[in-house]
Amino acid sequence: MTPAPQARNLLHGVTLEAMVTELVAYFGWDDLGERIQIRSFNLEPSIPSSLKFLRKTPWARDKVEGLYLYMQREKARTAPRKIAMTTPPDHPTTAPFGSWASPVSAALIAGATIRLGQIALHSSTVAWSEGRPQDQGRNVVVQRSADGVLRDLNPAPFDVRTRAHEYGGGAFLLHGSELLFSHDGDQKMYRIGEASVAGEPVALTTSANMRYADAVVDSARGRVIAVREDHSHGSIDAVATLVAISLRDGAEQVGTEQVGTEHVCTEQVLASGHDFFSTPRLRPDGQQLAWLAWDHPNMPWDGSTLWLADVAGDGSLVDARVVAGGPSESIFQPEWSPGGVLHFASDRTGWWNLYRLSGLGAEASGEPLCPMEAEFGQAQWAFGMSCYGFDGRGNIVCAFTQAGRSQLARIDASTLQLHFIATPFCTITDLKVGADFAAFIGGSEAAPSAVVRIDLLTQRCEVLRSASSSEVDVAYVSRAEAITFPTEGGLQAHALFYAPVNPRFTGPPGEPPPLIVMSHGGPTSTATPAFNWSIQYWTTRGFAVVDVNYGGSTGYGRDYRARLAGQWGVVDVDDAVNAARFLAERGSVNPARSAIRGGSAGGYTTLCALTFRSFFQCGASHYGIGDLEALARDTHKFESRYLDGLIGPWPAAQARYRERSPINFTERLSSPMILLQGLEDKAVPPAQAQAMFDAVRAKGLPVALLMFEGEQHGFRRAATIQRALEAELYFYGRIFGFTPAGSIEPVAIENL
């Protein structure tokens, strides 16, 4: 991590001892050792012994200097700015937990944050999508030129989002000076750039029943190849294919029922016959196409196949064959090297590791590149996910997860040796690689996530765009403590614990703080230690938070994911309860004032915990599942057989669905709850929240329900985000008996 020459003047006069001392104080011994990848540094936790090692090791000193410069930039960047409070007093005020005044307001989270999404590269430019809550959640593609100029590529009201698989992803790509994208309003594909008329996007497709994603350009044939979902017969019966969409055909005409200009293009079906397709990737010479496919009842992280076909003269595919994968092997992100060698990630050994295809025809096989107990892949909830790419020399630049943290690295193309690239980020997603640089979304523990560009020669990181225009004083930031705790069956599970932090306040003497248990979505998702405004919202008010990576979460290998097979509503709930018990037993939290919250699948875990366990005093379900039978009958195609693996085949296992549905056992409920739901949610229909509310109200327990117009599965609008957070805080205040600081609109709570 050698500092750039222009930055070395910042090191002038700073001794190595001073650097190490300050770094240790900032990061801690273990974290510092991990960041600079020096094992002996961790093993010799004293400054004198570390200095002795560093002075004998120039490359290690370079890493320390680079990290020291980053730390100084972070300190300057995270200094009190827009939302800083006055200097904390020498003696903090004693006040009830939950009532502390916080600089992290719901309005700030809703209005000053954006959702950073897909990244794309073209030459030396970087582009990314950002969802803007203040613009009704509209998604805009922003491009940064080589000279640092930012500009929006899609004009209002165009919203770059595809609803393929409902969760979308892979909604745009760059083609020379053009942007090709899916528009949320009609799900058509558009182009804007040289072919545009008066700067207006031109429609490439015509049917509103089609959805497109994960497109790649076939320049030689003047077309794009994309995944297409045909919803002509409804969401549950959507037909997936790979199609080629011409960029040359058609006549331009002004559309009358949609914004923009319509450009009628022909579409050629290239591959069909599977329930799902993703990740079409064209060999650099255009002669072969690779893609992924899978079928019910599998999800892509359960089992998928990697296909390879030759591209014929007329553009069709011939000799299509499976080269990797199967019903119990998950393949992730096929990519071609610059030399035309197909690479991919597979979990055949229990971990998503990288492979390259060697041999021809029936003799083709996957050669492991760097076997290790780490994840070079992710649960493919969205299109376009990326964990690796190739630099200008053919080396692999990759991001992998190990022990819950991301690490950037380079795999030498000739020796297959893995070399760590030191960065200050604990999560790295959507990695895209150029000739001598890479870009990714990086999350650190003390600052909001950001689009980051890293120079692969100097290893210097540059933040191109932060997810937040506001930053909180680091004195208010609670950093994650990774915990491993015992759970059912003699097993261990993982979580991230956040203690309450607010330098202006302290809780009543001898009283541990209340606890909020967070259960992530998916359930095949993961909690990361990256800075999260929503977590800081609670910790700065006096709550402790534990974000649980229950059995079934990604990032810990296939066996850990498989713990949830047939056990959803059991294993996840056990782990949530046991995480809370572990913290209570060590004295970190008050078990008599504990809540559980979660969204989507995490909302189901929340409702199950409140129904089938008696540990928590209240909970908050954000678009959570209360009726598994209703979900099995009324959902979209992508998840329509998901429950086969989590619960059992439907309807053969109908009895188990009923046994695991909280809606059927409201007589067991003894804890209040608040339910928050979008009225346009297709993944978890609003009828589920209404039914749960009616049942809890009839039971006589305190319950609140907030329905939000225009919201889908996950809240996107600023007003909704703010109202949901404040409503939940108000609810906890009424249940736990504290008055939140500031002015919050009351919530109607039945039976209270």
What is each PLM-predicted segment?
Residues M1-I83, T87-P88:
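Long, compositionally biased intrinsically disordered regulatory segments in eukaryotic proteins
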Residues T86-R115, S145-Y167, I192-R211, V243-S278, ...:
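Multi-bladed beta-propeller domains
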Residues R115-A120, E130, R151-D152, A213, ...:
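Non-catalytic accessory segments flanking enzyme active sites
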Residues L121-S123, L174-G176, D218-A220, P284-D285, ...:
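Residue-level detector of Asp-centered blade-edge/turn motifs that repeat once per structural unit
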Residues V126, L179, V224, L289, ...:
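Hydrophobic beta-strand positions that form the internal "hydrophobic ladder"
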Residues E130-V140, V160-E166, F181-M189, T206-Y212, ...:
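A flexible loop/linker signature enriched in serine peptidases of the S9 family
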Residues P297, A467-A592, G599, R633, ...:
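Cap/lid segment of the alpha/beta-hydrolase catalytic domain
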Residues V548-L752:
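Active-site-proximal cap/loop segments of hydrolase catalytic domains
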